[in-house]
Amino acid sequence: GGCCFGKDVAGLLATGQEYGYTASMLRATIDINEGQRATAVRKLQRELRVLKGRRIALLGLTFKPGTDDLRDAPALDIARRLLTAGAVVSAYDPVVKKLSEEYAAVRIGCDAYDAATRVDAVVLVTEWPELTGIDPSALHRVMRGNLVVDSRNAYSETAFAAAGLHLVGFGW
């Protein structure tokens, strides 16, 4: 993710093609990077079955912690896919307080627990320290459902299970 990664890799790929070189590893890198965004939505759909009408909270909107940069942020692509599927989306990010008009349907919470209030599932998208350090018991108390999709593999499966949450990571 991030604003430059895809553009930089695509530039390298194009340069290679100009010289008659097929950079299959670069093409695969682009495909995998873009596919991770769809993976989060697929995991939600696998667990929840139907996304229409489901309430989903996205934790972390920027492409990485420590920035306010939303250019090519995975969270925005995930939000777009969820909205298209008919989900109701809320979000929280420590520095993002407002999204562009395109994402007017996304409710921005004042904190992670506010964004997660009465949701069916939470998706950790960006590993901000305050989001990776979230209290699983407090999170579960405000949620309607118990599903947490951890796209950063930052959470402890044991701690989340002890709090009554079903944690789904990436790569497992």
Question: Model features per residue range: what roles?
Answer:
Residues 1-172:
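Structural/interface elements that position substrates and couple domains in central-metabolism enzymes
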